[in-house]
Structures are given as C-alpha cells and as structure tokens.
Amino acid sequence: MSDLRRIRALLREVERRRARNSLAVYAGLHIPAEIEADDLPGLHKLSLPARYIPAAHHRLILEKLQEVEAGKIKRLMILSAPGTAKSTYASVLFPAFYMGRHPTHSVVCASQTQDLADRFSRRARNAVGSEIHRSVFGSGLAQDQRAAGHWETEQGGEYHATGVQPFAGRRADLFLTDDLIRGRADADSKIVRESTWQWILGDLRPRLKPGAAWVNINTRYNEDDPSGRILPKEAFGKSGWFEAKDGEKWYVLCLAAVIETPEE
C-alpha cells in the first residue's frame, strides 16, 4: 500500500470514529447519496460534490438534533419552508444515527400519510443497513428486514412508521412527526386540523415512554396547526426555549415564519 493510500485509509478511520459521536460527521458520510432532488429543488443528486458541506441552516438543524440525542432537548420543533432538506436530516439521517447510538431503543416516525412515512422509513433503514453505518457503530440492521414500515436493529431496537391514523403496540423513546398536515388546503381545513390534533392527543402522546424525546418538523401554513396549538403566541417567528401550552418546555428552531402565500 502506497503512503497516499495509507493516509487516505487513516483519514477514513478518523472520520468514522468522529461519526460515532457527531451527527454532522455521520450525515456527511452518507451525503451526497442521501440528498434527493425533491429536497433541493433544481439540484440533481449526481451534481453534488463528493464532499457535501451543510448550509448554515442545515448546521443549525444538525446541532439541535444532536442535543436531542444527548438528552439535552426533550421537545424540539423545527419550522422551515419546503425544499430545505429538513426531512433528510431530521427524519432519515437523525433516526439512523440515533439508533446507532441507542441500538435497543424504539423510534416512531409519523407523517401525513403512511406512504410518506414509509418513504422516510426505507431511507433510514437503508442508512442503518449500510456498510457506512456498520463501519461507524459496529452493528446495523437485523437480518431479513424488508418491510418498509417496520424494521429492527441487531440489538432489538425498533423503527415504526405510521400515517396520521390509529396504531397499536408501539411506544417510543424517540417520536418524530414530519409534516402531519399535507399542505395549505388541508391546513386551512378546520376538520383536518382538529382530527390531526386529536390524533396527537389520543395516539401520539400515550405512546411516549417516560423521558422520551419528541421532534416535530413542519412547514407552517396556518396559525392553528399543531405547532400553533402547542406554542405560545410569543414564540411565533422566533427561535429559542419556550414554555408551551402543553406544559412542556420546547426548543423552537424557526427557519421560516408562517408562510403567507403559496409562492413564498
């Protein structure tokens, strides 16, 4: 092996060791493969450089998600406009990293439909089942884990995907909710907003284990969406810690204010 190859191999090993403790480094090992055209409009994944450097708002997302993994934040709300790759980081790479760090834990990811939740699940499963993940954490996906909506780690940790619908038998150490309301039309429907809120009260909250973390990711189209029902009015358009209406202390990462027009 040439000196150059040895240096490259050493650098790869250093990167893998750093990735065990750093979500940002772990994400960097998977990207650009994990960035998709629908996350970054107009940018095809094959056109990305070999080493993707997260944008400033991505670094903020990664920083706060890392604090969730470390137990420093139990309630995190990420509010952002569409097309900012928030789901790639928060609903795909973060649960994969989290399950590498906590391979016996249970993760539930919910979205507006079962199909979208399954899509996040497949991508997270592929990350946990990758050679990259195994080289970082020394373990990975259990054998024969082909189901889109439910899979396990070798140590017995579980990942479950669901739409906004009743689900039984799953309790979570980490609960991810990603755009529970489909878009402006649904957000403007009082019936949809109320049914989504009742799902949160009746299905989500009872599934949180004691000490569990909840990360809510969404684009805001209506002030009466789930985020609006949780947060106090003084939190709108701001980032930081807030005492919420649900009696919990939430950290809000607001990357965009409430969207006022469909074009924004």
Question: Could you say what each language-model-derived stretch is?
Answer:
Residues 1-84, 88-264:
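Short, flexible loop motifs at catalytic/binding sites
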